[in-house]
Amino acid sequence: MAGSVADSDAVVKLDDGHLNNSLGSPVQADVYFPRLIVPFCGHIKGGMRPGKKVLVMGIVDLNPESFAISLTCGDSEDPPADVAIELKAVFTDRQLLRNSCISGERGEEQSAIPYFPFIPDQPFRVEILCEHPRFRVFVDGHQLFDFYHRIQTLSAIDTIKINGDLQITKLG
């Protein structure tokens, strides 16, 4: 992992057009970030809605085991926030697992993908597009899978969490 930081320092406000870096300084969404700190937790202003997209660009670590990108309903630890979608890249099995966790209960895990898109020590671009019935997930511009909503109040999905063996270079 690239490092860690206290929870209060790691919160970054995601806006439709503006971001704050991990030091709280405002920057434009199209500005290249010099490696944001992992684990990362950021607020998605206004939550998700059909047509809204979350972009994560980064570089996989040289010897990765796994990394995860989650969209959650807040950042509470106790009780844990509901997880609308968790994408977990597992390098030993070359799997991209998807699941949710609502009121402490994990849903049915999904794993079918046409190919494993992540390569150690290489950059990647993940786009999570919110549509009315589902999240549509693209990696490096290719649609990889759909994940149907298990949380129906999309605006409650207002937090992104990223952890594991990667470096974040840009969020939007």
Curated annotation (Swiss-Prot):
Stretch forming the signal peptide: none
Q: In this chain, where does the modification N-acetylalanine occur?
A: A2
What do the Gene Ontology cellular component annotations say? collagen-containing extracellular matrix
Residue stretches making up the Galectin domain: 39-168
GO molecular function terms attached to this record: carbohydrate binding
The family database entries (InterPro entries) matched by this protein are listed as:
ConA-like_dom_sf, Galectin-like, Galectin_CRD
Modified residue Phosphoserine is at which positions?
A: S22, S25
Q: Entry's Pfam families?
A: Gal-bind_lectin (PF00337)
> Is Phosphoprotein among the key words of this record?
yes
Q: Does the keyword Phosphoprotein apply?
A: yes
Which keywords belong to this entry? Acetylation, Lectin, Phosphoprotein
Functional note: Does not bind lactose, and may not bind carbohydrates.
Give the multimer and partner information. Monomer.
What is the protein name given in its UniProt record?
Answer: Galectin-related protein
Q: Which organism is it from?
A: Mus musculus
Q: What is the lineage of its organism?
A: Eukaryota, Metazoa, Chordata, Craniata, Vertebrata
Question: Which gene is transcribed and translated to give this protein?
Answer: Lgalsl
